[in-house]
From Swiss-Prot:
Belongs to the plant dehydrin family. InterPro entries: Dehydrin, Dehydrin_CS. Residues 147-164 have a biased composition (Basic and acidic residues). Residues 105-115 have a biased composition (Low complexity). Residues 42-51, 128-138 have a biased composition (Gly residues). Keywords: Stress response. GO terms for biological process: cold acclimation; response to abscisic acid; response to water deprivation. PANTHER family: DEHYDRIN RAB16B, DEHYDRIN XERO 2-RELATED. It comes from the Eukaryota. Residues 42-164 are annotated as: Disordered. It comes from Oryza sativa subsp. japonica. The lineage of its organism: Eukaryota, Viridiplantae, Streptophyta, Embryophyta, Tracheophyta. The keyword Signal does not apply. This is Dehydrin Rab16C.
Length: 164
């Protein structure tokens, strides 16, 4: 069939570089599979209907780029030893830290090392906040100079205008 290609009356199976069918010389275009001009040569190389094409294999290459998921779970590998230094955490401590409610022992140890500073971490004293929110409460005085650490949200709230 190679010697009949491109001549009038014989369908030339033309494809682009991607294997897609390309319109013929007379604008006939690509036909549906099985609906082309069937050409049966003597050698039987292309025995069958014209217009049938081999599917192109698509290769997925990432180019060496690692794709990571958006979720992340990290925990510090060291913690305060109470003497101003750091010590490595063991596997047991890391697992306990990830479990919900697994930090019960850590809070008691930290409170014993810190002594009684007057209240647990995260508690806020809202003095004068009885009533229907008249805005006469005292904010900002809940930490004062007692040496308590401020929470992350409290630091943000402190920086917002109009929240005093």
């Amino acid at each position: 069939m190679e010697n009949y290609q491109g001549q009038h009356g014989y369908g030339a199976d033309r494809v682009d570089v991607y294997g897609n069918p390309v319109a013929g010389q007379y604008g006939g275009g690509a036909t549906a599979p099985g609906g082309g001009h069937g050409v049966m040569g003597m050698g039987g190389h292309h025995a069958g209907a014209g217009g049938q094409f081999q599917p192109v294999k698509e290769e997925h290459k990432t180019g060496g780029i690692l794709h990571r998921s958006g979720s992340s779970s990290s925990s510090s590998s060291s913690e305060d030893d109470g003497m101003g230094g750091r010590r490595k955490k063991g596997i047991k401590e890391k697992i306990k830290e990830k479990l919900p409610g697994g930090n019960k022992g850590n809070n008691q140890q930290q409170q014993q090392m810190m002594g009684n500073t007057g209240g647990a971490y995260g508690q806020q004293g809202h003095a004068g906040m009885t009533g229907a929110g008249t805005g006469t409460g005292v904010h900002g005085a809940e930490y004062g100079n007692t040496g308590e650490k401020k929470g992350f949200m409290d630091k943000i709230k402190e920086k917002l205008p109009g929240q005093h």
